[in-house]
Amino acid sequence: MAKTESPKISPIKSSDSKKGFSKRVVRWTSVSIVSAIMTLGAWAFASPIGSTPDDDYHLVSIWCGQGFRDGICEEGSEPREVVVRETLMEYPFCYAFNPDDTATCKQTEEFAPTTRSNGGENPRIFYWVMSWFASNDLTASVISIRFFNSILIVLGFAAVTFALPRHLRRVPVVSAVSIALPLGLFILPSTNPSAWGVYAVVLFFSALLGFVLTKDRRSRWILGPIALATLLMSAGSRPDSALYTLVAIAAVIIITFTRKMITPVNLSIAAALLLMGAIFLFGSANTSATLTGAPGGGLTTFTGGQLYANIINLPTLWVGGFGVWGLGWLDTAMSPIVWVVGWGVFLSLLFSAIMYFNLQQGLSVSLIFAALIFVPLLALSASGLLVGQFVQPRYLTGLLGMLIAAAMFRTSMNSGPLMSRAQVWIIGFALVFAHIVALRTNMGRYLTGMSEVAENLDYGFEWWWVDRPASGELFWFSPNLVWITGSVAFAVFLVSLWKLRAELGLPGYNEWTKETASVGSSATAPKKRKTTTPKKVLLTKKAKPRKKT
């Protein structure tokens, strides 16, 4: 949308400083990017081939994403039938739904026919992009896809954060961290379309928000293409994510709206974005399942009692991604410490921001929250199904991230929620500990099964990517190495965010201090915030001095 000026919203240019980046900022930015990729890399190795829900369908769809190719995806004898490596279809089912079974499955060279692949039910963009990594070496292909998705999303967040005005940089950063544990970290480095569906919609919201508000031309040239690319990623991965892009567009319009924005250029851009999202949404056969329920349905008659049951049980879908529901094929149960920390951090961020909402921000957040309620209820009610059937938490995790993104919006550096150093460090330590537990639990489920808790992941395992060296080498690509590396990398990532708190405008950054920001919209220290008491909380009026008589 064309840049606008508003008396209520004061965009800050993202390149006011001519000093450029300081060595400290470059160093910690590099550390944050590398540590984020290393964390996701550990999760990429933490589970075997086909470990996300419906991966038999998604893997075949990826291998056939470019149509028929000799030795990759061949034409079958029946309509919609394709012939692919049997391992793509059968490998997940040697351990799926049986948490006590390890992933000791054999890969075969044989090909077999199947009709379980994408025939237009889902958008084709995700499968087409991932299909470039498809080969006869299934292990190398799957790991390559997982790392590609990890690097793509991390660099996307880095680019958006760099281009945003400093007072908006907390929007993508805080929202990404808030939904990371554990589902976000598990699903992003995977072959599941939700790898894009969860985080790309948050990126789209953040990039579009910055594009509307920033006045800096260079930033707009970065944010505009990213907004377009992430719209294609979101809408091109899942039909429900296409619906969420429409919600994101509406939320951005509400939160930034002024009368000066009503111009032919802005209206054209908004209409074009809405049209693109709608094309992907209604161009997929599974859209009927997203809006009107699962094919085949469940209950023949859906009563008010079932609707009431869905309403009161709906929050389990919101908290499911924080560990209440299992990972993998929903069969890897997490320790309560994981979801208590994840959901607790999410709620603390949301509630700390509510008191700073203006009317527009409140309406924008309310729109996203309404989508969290009515989208799953509509799908379940139309299908005659109950909470726990058909709709999974990963379908809503992107909306939860967008909810935090909208809540973190602020109009300037002198607005929005703050947190003390103690609060931030408590959150940081809790996230690090919960992440250690989540990663180890996920690895242990496939190494030894959930019935056994190994004291040492390097011993007694039945599955791993490589065999244990017979010579007893001290350093090798072991499960413990992956677990420790991923745990340390996540802790380093959070520390790097703390070190960049001034540049990122994070809630833990105290605007009263004299810290300087060497990057972005404001290179000088922000002015001291006025400590005025809101009129609404004044209980008494200041007594006037009496006149002497």
Predicted regions: what they are:
Residues 256, 277-278, 290-303, 421-521, ...:
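Transmembrane helical bundles and short interhelical boundary loops of multi-pass, membrane-embedded
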Residues 67-139:
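Interfacial juxtamembrane loops and adjacent helix segments
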Residues 132, 144-168:
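Transmembrane-helix motifs of polytopic, lipid-linked glycan transferases
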Residues 1-42, 265-273, 423-428, 488-533, ...:
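Start-transfer (signal-anchor) and selected internal transmembrane alpha helices
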